[in-house]
Amino acid sequence: MRKYDKIIIGAGLYGLYSALFCCRRGQNVIVLECDSTPFRRATYINQARVHQGYHYPRSISTAMKSAGYFERFNKDYAFCVNKEFDQIYATSAEYSWSNGKQFKEFCKAANIPCEELHPGNYFKDGMCDGVFRTREYTYDAMILKDYFMEELAKYPNSVEIKYGVDIRSIDKDTDAFVVHTADGGAYQSGFVLNATYAGTNQILDMVGYEKFGIKYELCEISAM
């Protein structure tokens, strides 16, 4: 059984960022990924936007926190960010919990920019009661992936990434976790980072921890 300073489950943005963070501090890390390559799921699907909190009108504190991370992400990873387009938000005139006036007030309170536009410029009359030009960007997930893989390659003795991993169980005793995989592998560490995003509850359930109340929705995003 191999022992590590950190076991990271998931090779998306959070997983590889964490692995690089640990390697730079001299720690021995293994990343376990179920897919055949990194950045195959949420990190790739969510590249449609580097969001600034506009979709959190129910929580100003969350929006403000998102805005702070928006600035940090664009500073740290400017090499993969595309800013050359308009990002338009609209509030529906029907069946919406937020209207145009509320959205505008929310943006002002959260200190995030929005420019009010005429709804008829983008939508049929009566469909939307508010349309706004905002400041959000997209990023190229493949460029970002290549960056992390190149940086991690500088630490061949500190990091190991295993692909196609099927985690079957996780044992926990007083001071360590043991992750068991379908191929008979066993990996031990006092620290396990669950960076699986949509698979978070599957991992929590294996350890016997309380699961999050997550609602899953099937989404399709077109980035042009």
Protein language model features and the residues they cover:
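Central helical "cap/lid" subdomain
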Residues: 39, 185-224
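Glycine-rich FAD pyrophosphate-binding loop
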Residues: 23-44
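Beta1/beta-strand and adjacent pyrophosphate-binding region of the FAD-binding site
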Residues: 1-14, 30
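Helical element adjacent to the flavin cofactor pocket in flavoenzyme catalytic cores
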Residues: 132-191, 195-202
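Hydrophobic anchor at the start of a short beta-strand
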Residues: 27-29, 114, 192
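Dinucleotide-binding Rossmann-like beta1-alpha1 core, especially the glycine-rich loop
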Residues: 47-122, 127-130
